[in-house]
Swiss-Prot record:
This is Large ribosomal subunit protein bL31. It comes from Phenylobacterium zucineum (strain HLK1). The gene is rpmE. Pfam families: Ribosomal_L31. GO terms for cellular component: ribonucleoprotein complex; ribosome. One of its GO terms (molecular function) is structural constituent of ribosome. GO terms for biological process: translation.
Length: 74
C-alpha cells in the first residue's frame, strides 16, 4: 500500500454562532486550528423554520436575491 496518501487528520476547535465550542477531528488546517461558523444548525433557516435571516457574508445573499428575487412566492 502507498505511504502518505491520506491527509493529516487532527483535532480542531469549532466555534458555533452562539459561541459554543467543541473539538472534532478534521483535515482542515493544522492541529489546534479554529473553525468559526457563519451558520450552524441553531441558526440555519432549514432547521429553524425560516425565522432567522441569513448573514450576508461577501454579498452572496444579496447577489442571489437580486438575481432570483422576482421568483419568490407572495
Amino acid at each position: 500500500m502507498k505511504q502518505d496518501t491520506h491527509p493529516d487528520y487532527h483535532f480542531i476547535t469549532v466555534v458555533m454562532t452562539d459561541g459554543t465550542t467543541y473539538k472534532t477531528r478534521s483535515t482542515l488546517g493544522k492541529e489546534g486550528d479554529t473553525l468559526n461558523l457563519d451558520i450552524d444548525p441553531k441558526t440555519h433557516p432549514a432547521w429553524t423554520g425560516g425565522g432567522h435571516q441569513l448573514l450576508d457574508r461577501g454579498g452572496r445573499v444579496s447577489r442571489f436575491n437580486a438575481k432570483f428575487g422576482a421568483f419568490t412566492r407572495k
